[in-house]
C-alpha cells in the first residue's frame, strides 16, 4: 500500500471462513487480522501510470473481467469484460515499457497458457497466442505417464532488452520457457528452461535494484507408477520444499538455489488427510519487496502447510553451510511413503532414519542411516537429503563412521531435491560415490572426515575424494551436466549383499563451501 502497509488477502479456493486480510506495518515481521467488506478490492496491483488498482478475475462460464478502481481503493470501480472464455490461475499484472503496458498471465482452454495485454492502463485488453508444450510420454524409469495438463500457471517478467520472459509449469522434468518481443501479444515456441520443476508453479519477478528473483520447487518426483495414465495425477511426490534463486545479470546466471522452507508436515503419518483431503505442500509462491533486498513471501498450499516467510537477499549469496543435527532433522528430508494414495493425490509418511545420541559427545546427536525392509512402504530404500548454496566449484565434507558390516550406502551430489528413497538419483545425480570401506580405504570403526572437491566448469576434471585429508585414488566423473552447480547431498541406504540388513552409516556433521577455481 502507499503508506507501507502489507496486506495478505483471504480469498480463493482454500480461503478461511469470513472476509478479511492480514495486515503488517513492520515489513512482514508481525501480522494482524483485519475484517473487510466482501466487495472490497482484493490483492489488486496499482498502475504505475495512474495509480489505480487493477485486477483480472475469472468468472468461469461468464469469462474473464477486469476490475479497476476509480479514485483508488476507497473510490468506485469499473468492471469490464476481457474474454468470453474463462481462465485459471490469473496472475497479478506485470508492468513493461516503463509501466505503459500491463501484462497478465493465465492459462486455460487448450492445455496452454497465454497473456492478456493492455496498453491503456487496463481499460481494454488483448489476448496473446496460446503457448502449448509437448505431452509427457513416459519411458525410462517411468511405468506410467505423468498428468498431462499442458503448459499452465505461467509467470512473466520483462528483461532489460525489452523482451518478456515466460516460465510455465509442465509435466516434464524442467519448467518450459517462451519469449515475446512485442509486449506479450505473441510468444515464441516454448523450450525447456534450465530450472528443474515438475507439475509445480514457478514465480519470477524483478527487485527494486534490477535483480531477478525466482521461486520454484527445484524438485523431481518419483517415477510414475503403472496406474498413472496421463489423464490426472495419481500422487504428488515433489511438493515438500520451496526454493529461491537470484540473478544479477538478467537471468544469464543464478545463485542461491536455497531451500526457503521445508514442509513442516513432511514426516507425518497422517500427512495425506490431516486438515482435510485437499491440495497441500509447499508449491506456489507470491512475494513483495517492502524494503530494498528485504523479501516477504507467501508460500504453500493448505492451512497446515502454507506460511509467510521474510528473508534478506544477502542470504542467497552465502557460499557455505554446515549442519551437526543440533536442530534435529529440521534441515533434512528423510521420509518414506506409506503405500496407499489418500486424500488429494497424497501418501502418508514415516521418518525413514534415526537420530541417536553421539557415542562420544554428550548432548550431540548423530544420524543413523540403514536399509530396513518394509513391505508397507512404496519404497523401503532409506535416504537423507540436505541442501546448501549452489556451488560451481565446491567442497563437501562429512564426518562419518562406517562400522563393520555397513553396506549398500551411496552418496550423491546433485543439483536438485529428489525423494530420499529415490534410487534414480544414482543415475541422474552429478557425482556418485559408493560409501564402502573398500572404496574409501577405511579399516576401522572410528570417525573419518570424507571430502569431495569438484569444479563443474571443468567437466573433464573428475571430482577428488579425500579421507582424513589424504587423497584417494578414486576419482568421480561428472555423470550428468548441471547448469548451476551442486546444491544437494543425498545419502542412500539400500540392501546389502543377498538382500541382507546391513549395519548403519553414521553421520555426525556435514559442511559445504565454495572453492576457488583450479
Where is each model-derived feature located?
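Flexible glycan-contacting loops in extracellular carbohydrate-active proteins
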Residues: 474-508
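Asp-box/BNR beta-propeller blade signature and adjacent active/binding-site loops
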Residues: 1-329, 338-341, 352-355, 373-375, ...
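Extracellular beta-strand elements of beta-rich domains used
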Residues: 325, 505-512
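Extracellular glycan-recognition surfaces and repeat-rich motifs
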Residues: 330-369
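Beta-strand-rich interaction surfaces with strong enrichment in secreted/lumenal proteins
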Residues: 191, 382-388, 435-442, 478, ...
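Secretory/extracellular carbohydrate-interaction modules
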Residues: 362-436
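Short, aromatic/His-centered strand-loop micro-motif at the edge of beta-sheets
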Residues: 429-451
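Short tryptophan-centered beta-strand motifs in secreted/extracellular beta-sheet-rich domains
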Residues: 398, 446-457, 463-465
